[in-house]
Amino acid sequence: MYGKIIFVLLLSAIVSISASSTTEVAMHTSTSSVTKSYISSETSDKHKWDTYPATPRAHEVSEIYVTTVYPPEEENGEGVQLVHRFSEPEITLIIFGVMAGVIGTILLIYYSIRRLIKKSPSDVKPLPSPDTDVPLSSVEIENPETSDQ
């Protein structure tokens, strides 16, 4: 049962990491979600309020301003390589650092779950051995109190 819990925790960590990395891309590509009836054109009349509804309705979509930046292209159609702030070894160290952090977090969660599951020595009572309660002699001795009566 605990193996399933650990599996679900690891799976949820992977899903949350992949979801956080794809939300930024989704924000830049969702320009077509605004309906045409809701987009207002810029006019010089500052008192024109009929392009914006007073209360939003369920079928209308709020405006989203998205700026998409494309890398510059050369005249022959090939893209120009972007210049990064970090060198290749620094980028490699950053990637390995993030990977080590994620793996370390997963192992820390696993270790803490194992510590919670494992019983402490004070909670575990040793099983009594059968020889400790019985005297070592094979001869039975009667209790003198019961025999005198």
UniProtKB/Swiss-Prot annotation:
Location within or outside the cell:
Cell membrane
Q: Which residues lie on this side of the membrane: Cytoplasmic?
A: 114-149
Report the glycosylation sites.
21-23, 29-32, 35, 37, 40, 43-44, 51, 55, 62, 68
Q: Answer yes or no on keyword Cytoplasm.
A: no
Chain positions found as Phosphoserine: 137, 147
Record-linked Gene3D superfamilies: 1.20.5.70
**Transmembrane regions listed in the UniProt entry:** 91-113
Alphabetized, the UniProt keywords read:
Cell membrane, Glycoprotein, Membrane, Phosphoprotein, Sialic acid, Signal, Transmembrane, Transmembrane helix
Keyword Kinase listed? The answer is no
Q: Which InterPro entries match?
A: Glycophorin (IPR001195), Glycophorin_CS (IPR018938), GYPA_B (IPR049535)
What binding partners and quaternary form does the record give? Answer: Homodimer. Component of the ankyrin-1 complex in the erythrocyte, composed of ANK1, RHCE, RHAG, SLC4A1, EPB42, GYPA, GYPB and AQP1. Interacts with SLC4A1; a GYPA monomer is bound at each end of the SLC4A1 dimer forming a heterotetramer.
According to its UniProt entry, what is the function of this protein?
Answer: Component of the ankyrin-1 complex, a multiprotein complex involved in the stability and shape of the erythrocyte membrane. Glycophorin A is the major intrinsic membrane protein of the erythrocyte. The N-terminal glycosylated segment, which lies outside the erythrocyte membrane, has MN blood group receptors. Appears to be important for the function of SLC4A1 and is required for high activity of SLC4A1. May be involved in translocation of SLC4A1 to the plasma membrane.
Similarity comment: family membership: Belongs to the glycophorin-A family.
Full protein name: Glycophorin-A
Taxonomy-wise, where does this protein's organism fall, top ranks first?
A: Eukaryota, Metazoa, Chordata, Craniata, Vertebrata
The gene it comes from is: GYPA
